[in-house]
Every structure is written in structure tokens, then in C-alpha cells.
Amino acid sequence: MNGSLTGSGLFTDLYELTMLSAYHAEAVDDLATFELWVRELPQDRNFLVVAGLQEVVDHLLALQFDDGDLSYLRSLEMFTPEFLDHLRDLRFTGDLWAMPEGNIAFAGEPLLRVRARRIEAQLVETFLLATVTFETMIATKAARVALASGARPFADFSARRAHGAAAAVQVARAAFIGGAAS
């Protein structure tokens, strides 16, 4: 496993990997389209501020399984050698459409859409959900604070309470997109 999760094929659920294995075994290689959208907003919330796209793009461009990832998957004794060889060569080759970061979105609107070979689209689902929903939540909260504070600037102080350095940077960036001064 590499030190960063950006681009790691292991940033997914085991369920997703078992689905990929089944697709590989059955030679399922069709194109699939997946959308990420919010069904409904909580009461007293009427908009979202989209964030997380830059991290998604970075992940998709760097996506791969390194030797450590494959060694770990091999140790699970759940996957065939042929499937693991397939993962070694797997790269994201699909298309991504997304609302630009900082845009306002409403319930029922797609925040992003992926069109790719089914195995690629399935693999990135967990990362997309985790990243876009988290960063959009932070950006939206920051926008609500900005609206409540009027013209007074506010800071996010994410490094003090975040769960690690990477999370602090992720929160600070999303808060800035939502209106934090720093």
C-alpha cells in the first residue's frame, strides 16, 4: 500500500472489489454511467455548495494498484491471479462531468457523472461518494456561516480539530470554497 490514498485502488469497499472480480470473471466490459446526486436536503437547508472535484480529478488521473496493494489483495485469498493481473494494469479511462466547485446545487441535481468501462466506474464509486459528499458538506456549512456572519470574515481553524493533516487540508480547501477567509 502506498503512503497516500490519492490514486490508490484500495480506496474502495471490499464489496466493490468483489463486484469487479465478478465482472472480470464474466467478461463484463460494457460502458456504464453513474451519477452522484442528493435525494433530498435536510429541513431548513435549501442548497449545497459543490466541492471535492479537484481531489476527484487528482484521484482519477493517478488511479492504480501498486505492488503493495496487490500483495495485500493476494493475501486475502479471495481473488484469482488473473484478476489481480488485470488490476495491475487498470487505469481510469472514462469521462467525468461535474458541476464546478463553488456552484450552488439543489436536491435532485447530479453533482457529477462518470461514464466509463463498468469495472472502472464501479471501482471509483466509493472514493467519489466519500470525497464529494464530505467536501460539499463542509463547503455548504461554510457558506451558511458566511451568510450568517454578513460582511465579517471568518476562519475555519480546521487543523485544530481535523482527523489528521490530510483531512485538515481537505476541510480548509472546502471551507474556502464555501466562503471562509482562511
Where are these regions (language model features)?
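Buried, small/hydrophobic-residue-enriched core segments of structured protein domains
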Residues: 2-31, 40-42, 78, 84-93, ...
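N-terminal, Lys/Arg-enriched amphipathic/low-complexity engagement segments
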Residues: 28-88, 97
